[in-house]
Amino acid sequence: MQKIFDAHLHLWDLGKIPISWIKDDEKLEQNYDFFRMKQEYKEFEFIGAMYVEVNSDDLEKEALFALEQKKLHNLLFCLADFKHKEELSSFREVMHVSKKGAKRLFEVDFEEKIEILKTFNIPFEACMKNEEL
């Protein structure tokens, strides 16, 4: 059986995490939980996943949800918040939602984040649109 590690897994429970950007999209405006995902991979030997933040409206609620998923399902996780940096496998910032787009990379607080990432040896994922590259 083919082994699979999902390196970019989004999960959400709309009762726990507010996510306004999925409103009015019937395919997205529903819960996507770990067991639903496991069903999608039933033809594979699932060996793990990296939970990636979903750009929710409440980073703290999402961090708590992600921590719960990590403990329940032994997931790695990538968040956009340093509050739980000792638990992070990776850090993510969604650039295309910033008014400055990729220019966000040159702001002082972003440089400070990079220093924290270097100190704690945490990989970084930038999410941006192709035209911003």
What are these regions (language model features)?
Residues M1-E68:
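An N-terminally biased module of ancient metal coordination in phosphate/nucleic-acid-related enzymes
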Residues D57-E132:
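Active-site gating/metal-coordination segments in enzymes
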